[in-house]
Amino acid sequence: MRGIRKGHALALRVGTPAKINLWLEIVRKREDGYHDLSSLMLPVAVYDHVEVAWSHEGGVRLSCDSAEVPDDRGNLAWRAADAYLEAAGVTRGVSIRLEKNIPVGAGMGGGSSDAAAVLLALNRLSENPLSEAVLHRLAVGLGADVPFFLHCVPALATGIGERLLPVHGIPDYPLLLVKPPISVSTGWVYGSLKLTRGESRIKLRSFLDRPWHLSEVLRNDLETVTLNEYPQLGQIKCWLMENGAVGSLMSGSGPTVFGVFAEQRLADGAGELARRVWKDCRVDVTRVLGTPVSARS
Protein backbone atom coordinates (compact mmCIF):
# COMPACT_ATOMS: atom_id res chain seq x y z
CA MET A 1 0.00 0.00 0.00
CA ARG A 2 1.64 3.22 -1.19
CA GLY A 3 0.66 6.78 -0.29
CA ILE A 4 0.65 9.42 -3.04
CA ARG A 5 -0.21 13.12 -2.96
CA LYS A 6 -3.00 14.52 -5.12
CA GLY A 7 -3.05 18.24 -4.50
CA HIS A 8 -3.46 18.60 -0.75
CA ALA A 9 -5.09 15.20 -0.33
CA LEU A 10 -3.40 11.91 0.45
CA ALA A 11 -4.43 8.99 -1.72
CA LEU A 12 -3.46 5.35 -1.23
CA ARG A 13 -2.64 3.12 -4.18
CA VAL A 14 -2.99 -0.61 -3.59
CA GLY A 15 -2.06 -3.65 -5.67
CA THR A 16 -4.92 -6.14 -5.34
CA PRO A 17 -4.05 -9.77 -6.19
CA ALA A 18 -6.23 -12.47 -7.68
CA LYS A 19 -6.81 -15.91 -6.16
CA ILE A 20 -7.20 -19.52 -7.15
CA ASN A 21 -8.87 -22.35 -5.26
CA LEU A 22 -6.55 -25.34 -5.00
CA TRP A 23 -9.62 -27.24 -3.92
CA LEU A 24 -13.26 -26.29 -3.51
CA GLU A 25 -15.62 -28.74 -1.86
CA ILE A 26 -19.29 -27.88 -1.44
CA VAL A 27 -20.22 -29.52 1.83
CA ARG A 28 -23.94 -28.74 2.11
CA LYS A 29 -26.65 -26.26 1.21
CA ARG A 30 -27.84 -24.22 4.18
CA GLU A 31 -31.39 -23.21 5.05
CA ASP A 32 -30.54 -19.57 4.23
CA GLY A 33 -29.70 -20.56 0.65
CA TYR A 34 -25.94 -20.26 1.02
CA HIS A 35 -23.55 -23.20 0.74
CA ASP A 36 -21.04 -24.39 3.33
CA LEU A 37 -17.72 -25.15 1.72
CA SER A 38 -14.13 -26.16 2.32
CA SER A 39 -11.56 -24.49 0.09
CA LEU A 40 -7.84 -23.82 0.09
CA MET A 41 -7.54 -20.28 -1.26
CA LEU A 42 -4.21 -19.04 -2.59
CA PRO A 43 -3.31 -15.45 -3.57
CA VAL A 44 -1.86 -15.13 -7.06
CA ALA A 45 0.46 -12.51 -8.59
CA VAL A 46 -2.06 -11.06 -11.06
CA TYR A 47 -3.13 -7.60 -9.89
CA ASP A 48 -5.72 -4.90 -10.22
CA HIS A 49 -4.71 -1.50 -8.84
CA VAL A 50 -7.01 0.56 -6.65
CA GLU A 51 -6.48 4.21 -5.71
CA VAL A 52 -8.53 5.58 -2.80
CA ALA A 53 -8.76 9.13 -1.40
CA TRP A 54 -11.09 11.23 0.71
CA SER A 55 -13.23 13.65 -1.30
CA HIS A 56 -14.79 17.00 -0.41
CA GLU A 57 -17.90 15.89 -2.30
CA GLY A 58 -20.27 13.62 -0.41
CA GLY A 59 -20.89 9.97 -1.16
CA VAL A 60 -18.83 7.57 -3.23
CA ARG A 61 -17.40 8.33 -6.66
CA LEU A 62 -15.80 5.52 -8.65
CA SER A 63 -14.11 5.46 -12.04
CA CYS A 64 -12.57 2.54 -13.90
CA ASP A 65 -10.53 2.00 -17.05
CA SER A 66 -12.73 -0.97 -18.06
CA ALA A 67 -16.17 -0.67 -19.61
CA GLU A 68 -16.99 -4.14 -18.23
CA VAL A 69 -17.08 -2.76 -14.68
CA PRO A 70 -19.97 -0.63 -13.30
CA ASP A 71 -19.14 2.68 -11.63
CA ASP A 72 -22.06 2.68 -9.18
CA ARG A 73 -23.58 0.45 -6.50
CA GLY A 74 -23.27 -2.47 -8.89
CA ASN A 75 -19.53 -2.43 -8.17
CA LEU A 76 -18.39 -4.27 -5.04
CA ALA A 77 -15.65 -1.70 -4.38
CA TRP A 78 -18.31 1.05 -4.40
CA ARG A 79 -20.39 -0.90 -1.88
CA ALA A 80 -17.30 -1.48 0.28
CA ALA A 81 -16.69 2.27 0.52
CA ASP A 82 -20.35 2.93 1.28
CA ALA A 83 -20.36 0.27 4.02
CA TYR A 84 -17.18 1.69 5.54
CA LEU A 85 -18.55 5.26 5.63
CA GLU A 86 -21.70 4.07 7.41
CA ALA A 87 -19.84 1.88 9.92
CA ALA A 88 -17.26 4.56 10.72
CA GLY A 89 -19.77 7.41 10.84
CA VAL A 90 -17.73 9.36 8.30
CA THR A 91 -19.44 12.22 6.47
CA ARG A 92 -16.69 12.90 3.95
CA GLY A 93 -16.91 11.45 0.47
CA VAL A 94 -14.63 8.87 -1.12
CA SER A 95 -12.99 8.85 -4.54
CA ILE A 96 -11.98 5.46 -6.01
CA ARG A 97 -10.04 4.76 -9.18
CA LEU A 98 -9.83 1.16 -10.45
CA GLU A 99 -7.30 -0.13 -12.95
CA LYS A 100 -8.51 -3.58 -14.00
CA ASN A 101 -6.14 -6.35 -14.97
CA ILE A 102 -7.77 -9.34 -13.29
CA PRO A 103 -10.38 -10.64 -15.76
CA VAL A 104 -14.00 -9.87 -14.89
CA GLY A 105 -16.27 -12.83 -14.08
CA ALA A 106 -13.31 -15.19 -14.16
CA GLY A 107 -13.48 -17.06 -10.84
CA MET A 108 -10.34 -15.25 -9.68
CA GLY A 109 -11.90 -12.91 -7.11
CA GLY A 110 -11.04 -9.60 -8.76
CA GLY A 111 -14.10 -7.73 -7.50
CA SER A 112 -13.70 -9.13 -3.98
CA SER A 113 -10.02 -8.20 -3.92
CA ASP A 114 -10.85 -4.64 -4.97
CA ALA A 115 -13.50 -4.38 -2.26
CA ALA A 116 -11.11 -5.58 0.45
CA ALA A 117 -8.49 -3.10 -0.77
CA VAL A 118 -10.98 -0.24 -0.41
CA LEU A 119 -11.78 -1.27 3.18
CA LEU A 120 -8.08 -1.47 4.07
CA ALA A 121 -7.20 1.81 2.36
CA LEU A 122 -10.01 3.76 4.02
CA ASN A 123 -9.02 2.33 7.38
CA ARG A 124 -5.43 3.45 6.78
CA LEU A 125 -6.62 6.94 5.80
CA SER A 126 -9.07 7.21 8.72
CA GLU A 127 -8.29 9.22 11.84
CA ASN A 128 -10.30 6.68 13.87
CA PRO A 129 -9.71 3.32 12.19
CA LEU A 130 -12.11 0.46 12.69
CA SER A 131 -11.05 -2.70 14.50
CA GLU A 132 -10.03 -5.81 12.59
CA ALA A 133 -13.20 -7.52 13.82
CA VAL A 134 -15.41 -4.77 12.37
CA LEU A 135 -13.53 -4.84 9.07
CA HIS A 136 -14.07 -8.61 8.92
CA ARG A 137 -17.79 -8.16 9.58
CA LEU A 138 -18.04 -5.60 6.79
CA ALA A 139 -16.14 -7.92 4.46
CA VAL A 140 -18.47 -10.85 5.19
CA GLY A 141 -21.46 -8.64 4.44
CA LEU A 142 -20.01 -7.76 1.04
CA GLY A 143 -19.28 -11.28 -0.19
CA ALA A 144 -17.89 -14.67 0.75
CA ASP A 145 -14.45 -14.09 -0.85
CA VAL A 146 -13.87 -10.58 0.53
CA PRO A 147 -12.59 -11.64 4.01
CA PHE A 148 -9.81 -13.71 2.40
CA PHE A 149 -8.44 -10.63 0.63
CA LEU A 150 -8.15 -8.64 3.86
CA HIS A 151 -5.03 -10.69 4.64
CA CYS A 152 -4.04 -12.27 1.31
CA VAL A 153 -2.23 -15.29 2.70
CA PRO A 154 -2.94 -18.94 1.84
CA ALA A 155 -5.92 -19.96 3.94
CA LEU A 156 -8.39 -22.77 4.44
CA ALA A 157 -11.86 -21.24 4.07
CA THR A 158 -14.87 -22.89 5.69
CA GLY A 159 -18.44 -21.85 6.46
CA ILE A 160 -19.54 -19.79 3.45
CA GLY A 161 -15.92 -18.67 3.17
CA GLU A 162 -15.87 -16.32 6.15
CA ARG A 163 -13.96 -18.64 8.51
CA LEU A 164 -10.30 -18.53 7.56
CA LEU A 165 -7.38 -20.58 8.87
CA PRO A 166 -4.00 -19.25 7.63
CA VAL A 167 -1.94 -22.07 6.14
CA HIS A 168 1.86 -22.03 6.17
CA GLY A 169 4.23 -24.11 4.08
CA ILE A 170 2.49 -23.67 0.71
CA PRO A 171 4.98 -23.70 -2.20
CA ASP A 172 5.08 -20.69 -4.52
CA TYR A 173 3.59 -22.87 -7.24
CA PRO A 174 4.37 -21.67 -10.80
CA LEU A 175 1.03 -21.25 -12.58
CA LEU A 176 -0.37 -20.95 -16.07
CA LEU A 177 -3.85 -19.39 -16.17
CA VAL A 178 -6.10 -19.72 -19.23
CA LYS A 179 -9.41 -17.83 -19.36
CA PRO A 180 -11.76 -18.27 -22.34
CA PRO A 181 -13.66 -15.19 -23.58
CA ILE A 182 -16.74 -15.89 -21.47
CA SER A 183 -17.95 -14.75 -18.06
CA VAL A 184 -19.68 -17.06 -15.62
CA SER A 185 -22.26 -16.01 -13.03
CA THR A 186 -21.37 -17.41 -9.62
CA GLY A 187 -25.04 -17.28 -8.64
CA TRP A 188 -26.02 -19.35 -11.67
CA VAL A 189 -23.37 -21.98 -10.93
CA TYR A 190 -24.40 -22.42 -7.30
CA GLY A 191 -28.06 -22.35 -8.26
CA SER A 192 -27.49 -25.16 -10.77
CA LEU A 193 -25.38 -27.30 -8.43
CA LYS A 194 -26.86 -30.68 -7.51
CA LEU A 195 -23.89 -32.38 -5.83
CA THR A 196 -23.27 -31.97 -2.09
CA ARG A 197 -20.74 -34.00 -0.18
CA GLY A 198 -22.08 -33.81 3.37
CA GLU A 199 -18.53 -33.49 4.68
CA SER A 200 -15.07 -32.44 3.51
CA ARG A 201 -12.94 -35.31 2.22
CA ILE A 202 -9.63 -33.51 1.74
CA LYS A 203 -7.40 -33.46 4.80
CA LEU A 204 -5.21 -30.37 5.16
CA ARG A 205 -2.53 -32.09 7.23
CA SER A 206 -2.07 -34.85 4.65
CA PHE A 207 -1.75 -32.24 1.91
CA LEU A 208 0.89 -30.25 3.81
CA ASP A 209 2.92 -33.42 4.27
CA ARG A 210 2.99 -33.86 0.47
CA PRO A 211 2.17 -30.48 -1.16
CA TRP A 212 3.27 -31.62 -4.63
CA HIS A 213 0.97 -34.68 -4.67
CA LEU A 214 -1.72 -32.54 -6.24
CA SER A 215 -3.79 -35.34 -7.74
CA GLU A 216 -4.99 -36.05 -4.21
CA VAL A 217 -6.40 -32.56 -3.61
CA LEU A 218 -7.26 -30.85 -6.92
CA ARG A 219 -11.05 -30.96 -6.64
CA ASN A 220 -13.70 -28.41 -7.55
CA ASP A 221 -17.32 -29.47 -7.12
CA LEU A 222 -18.47 -26.51 -9.24
CA GLU A 223 -16.84 -28.06 -12.30
CA THR A 224 -19.83 -30.39 -12.57
CA VAL A 225 -21.90 -27.35 -13.61
CA THR A 226 -19.49 -25.09 -15.49
CA LEU A 227 -17.62 -27.74 -17.51
CA ASN A 228 -20.91 -29.28 -18.59
CA GLU A 229 -22.04 -25.91 -19.96
CA TYR A 230 -18.65 -24.97 -21.45
CA PRO A 231 -16.82 -28.10 -22.72
CA GLN A 232 -13.84 -25.97 -23.80
CA LEU A 233 -12.79 -25.75 -20.16
CA GLY A 234 -12.32 -29.50 -19.99
CA GLN A 235 -10.28 -29.34 -23.19
CA ILE A 236 -8.02 -26.69 -21.64
CA LYS A 237 -7.55 -28.81 -18.51
CA CYS A 238 -6.45 -31.78 -20.61
CA TRP A 239 -4.17 -29.59 -22.74
CA LEU A 240 -2.41 -28.24 -19.66
CA MET A 241 -1.74 -31.75 -18.37
CA GLU A 242 -0.45 -32.82 -21.79
CA ASN A 243 1.92 -29.86 -21.84
CA GLY A 244 3.74 -30.28 -18.56
CA ALA A 245 1.37 -29.33 -15.75
CA VAL A 246 1.48 -31.54 -12.66
CA GLY A 247 -2.14 -30.64 -11.96
CA SER A 248 -4.98 -28.61 -13.48
CA LEU A 249 -8.31 -27.28 -12.17
CA MET A 250 -10.97 -24.67 -12.75
CA SER A 251 -10.76 -21.81 -10.23
CA GLY A 252 -13.88 -20.90 -8.30
CA SER A 253 -17.01 -20.92 -10.45
CA GLY A 254 -14.86 -20.46 -13.56
CA PRO A 255 -14.20 -20.07 -16.34
CA THR A 256 -10.46 -19.61 -15.59
CA VAL A 257 -8.50 -22.87 -15.65
CA PHE A 258 -5.06 -23.07 -14.06
CA GLY A 259 -2.17 -25.47 -14.44
CA VAL A 260 0.41 -26.00 -11.69
CA PHE A 261 3.98 -26.58 -12.88
CA ALA A 262 7.02 -28.01 -11.14
CA GLU A 263 9.31 -25.20 -12.34
CA GLN A 264 8.81 -21.63 -13.54
CA ARG A 265 10.63 -22.28 -16.83
CA LEU A 266 8.14 -25.04 -17.64
CA ALA A 267 5.22 -22.69 -16.99
CA ASP A 268 6.89 -20.04 -19.15
CA GLY A 269 7.32 -22.47 -22.04
CA ALA A 270 3.76 -23.75 -21.81
CA GLY A 271 2.53 -20.16 -21.66
CA GLU A 272 4.23 -19.30 -24.96
CA LEU A 273 2.59 -22.32 -26.59
CA ALA A 274 -0.80 -21.59 -25.02
CA ARG A 275 -0.88 -18.12 -26.57
CA ARG A 276 -0.55 -19.75 -30.00
CA VAL A 277 -2.99 -22.59 -29.38
CA TRP A 278 -5.69 -20.77 -27.39
CA LYS A 279 -5.69 -17.54 -29.36
CA ASP A 280 -9.10 -16.41 -28.13
CA CYS A 281 -8.17 -16.90 -24.46
CA ARG A 282 -6.47 -14.70 -21.87
CA VAL A 283 -3.19 -16.39 -20.86
CA ASP A 284 -1.15 -15.44 -17.76
CA VAL A 285 2.04 -17.03 -16.46
CA THR A 286 2.36 -16.26 -12.77
CA ARG A 287 2.84 -17.86 -9.34
CA VAL A 288 1.25 -18.30 -5.95
CA LEU A 289 2.04 -15.63 -3.35
CA GLY A 290 3.07 -16.86 0.05
CA THR A 291 3.24 -13.72 2.24
CA PRO A 292 1.05 -10.67 2.86
CA VAL A 293 3.99 -8.36 2.05
CA SER A 294 4.32 -9.61 -1.52
CA ALA A 295 0.56 -9.82 -1.93
CA ARG A 296 -0.06 -6.21 -0.91
CA SER A 297 2.95 -4.46 -2.40
UniProtKB/Swiss-Prot annotation:
Entry annotation: catalytic residues: 19, 145
Residues noted as binding ATP in the record, renumbered to the chain: 103-113
Catalytic activity annotation: 4-CDP-2-C-methyl-D-erythritol + ATP = 4-CDP-2-C-methyl-D-erythritol 2-phosphate + ADP + H(+)
Entry keywords, A to Z: ATP-binding, Isoprene biosynthesis, Kinase, Nucleotide-binding, Transferase
Family matches, as Pfam families: GHMP_kinases_C, GHMP_kinases_N
GO biological process, one term: isopentenyl diphosphate biosynthetic process, methylerythritol 4-phosphate pathway
EC number of this enzyme: 2.7.1.148
Gene3D superfamilies, per the entry: 3.30.230.10, GHMP kinase, C-terminal domain
UniProt pathway annotation: Isoprenoid biosynthesis; isopentenyl diphosphate biosynthesis via DXP pathway; isopentenyl diphosphate from 1-deoxy-D-xylulose 5-phosphate: step 3/6
Annotated GO MF terms: 4-(cytidine 5'-diphospho)-2-C-methyl-D-erythritol kinase activity; ATP binding
Disulfide feature: none
Signal peptide start and end residues: none
Function description: Catalyzes the phosphorylation of the position 2 hydroxy group of 4-diphosphocytidyl-2C-methyl-D-erythritol.
Family to which this protein belongs: Belongs to the GHMP kinase family. IspE subfamily.
Protein name: 4-diphosphocytidyl-2-C-methyl-D-erythritol kinase
